């Protein structure tokens, strides 16, 4: 029964870390990443569709992304979706593709992105702590139901705390790395 609680808690904490990793990938850093477009949806025959499913999206260099739609009539819809996504860039297009030219980030923009990263990191840590609380409640319920002894309860709570400390430390390390990446000129 305890092993199930441990496994469940660790699995949910892993998912929180993965979610944070995905969130960080959408933040712009020194060089442009195609992941900044992950949340852009294009109206494809009436269905909001991820941009990478209607064309190829590649980073040409540190400041340029090129989107080549598989169907040329989608170029206008792609432009519109990018403008609505408000990612700080205006699309340029020709008959073949859409080009996004990202200007170098100002210090103020870097600070704002770092602030967003800290907010995302804090949300992940709160999620991990909530998972710990749920696991602790389940363990205490087992002791109350006399399924485990007081000593087993104490050891189990310590184990959950070790998991929590480990995953919070991962969040902090990821945040530190992302802040360094964003602030690097």
Swiss-Prot record:
<keyword id="KW-0963">Cytoplasm</keyword>
<comment type="function">
    <text>Responsible for the release of ribosomes from messenger RNA at the termination of protein biosynthesis. May increase the efficiency of translation by recycling ribosomes from one round of translation to another.</text>
</comment>
<dbReference type="Pfam" id="PF01765">
    <property type="entry name" value="RRF"/>
</dbReference>
<dbReference type="GO" id="GO:0005829">
    <property type="term" value="C:cytosol"/>
</dbReference>
<comment type="similarity">
    <text>Belongs to the RRF family.</text>
</comment>
<dbReference type="GO" id="GO:0043023">
    <property type="term" value="F:ribosomal large subunit binding"/>
</dbReference>
<dbReference type="InterPro" id="IPR036191">
    <property type="entry name" value="RRF_sf"/>
</dbReference>
<keyword id="KW-0648">Protein biosynthesis</keyword>
<protein>
    <recommendedName>
        <fullName>Ribosome-recycling factor</fullName>
    </recommendedName>
</protein>
<dbReference type="InterPro" id="IPR023584">
    <property type="entry name" value="Ribosome_recyc_fac_dom"/>
</dbReference>
<dbReference type="InterPro" id="IPR002661">
    <property type="entry name" value="Ribosome_recyc_fac"/>
</dbReference>
<dbReference type="GO" id="GO:0002184">
    <property type="term" value="P:cytoplasmic translational termination"/>
</dbReference>
């Amino acid at each position: 029964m305890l092993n199930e609680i441990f496994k469940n808690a660790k699995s949910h904490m892993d998912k929180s870390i993965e979610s944070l990793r995905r969130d960080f990938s959408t933040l712009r850093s020194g060089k442009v990443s195609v992941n900044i477009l992950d949340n852009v949806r294009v109206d494809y025959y009436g269905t909001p569709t991820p941009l990478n499913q209607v064309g190829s999206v590649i980073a040409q260099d540190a400041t340029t992304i090129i989107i080549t739609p598989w169907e040329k009539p989608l170029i206008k819809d792609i432009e519109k979706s990018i403008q609505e996504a408000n990612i700080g860039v205006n699309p340029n297009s020709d008959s073949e593709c859409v080009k996004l030219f990202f200007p170098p980030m100002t210090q103020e923009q870097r600070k704002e992105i770092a602030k967003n990263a800290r907010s995302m990191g804090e949300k992940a840590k709160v999620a991990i702590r909530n998972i710990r609380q749920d696991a602790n409640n389940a363990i205490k319920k087992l002791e109350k139901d006399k399924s485990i002894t007081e000593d087993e309860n104490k050891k189990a709570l310590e184990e959950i705390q070790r998991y929590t400390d480990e995953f919070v430390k991962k969040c902090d390390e990821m945040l530190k790395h992302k802040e360094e990446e964003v602030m690097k000129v």
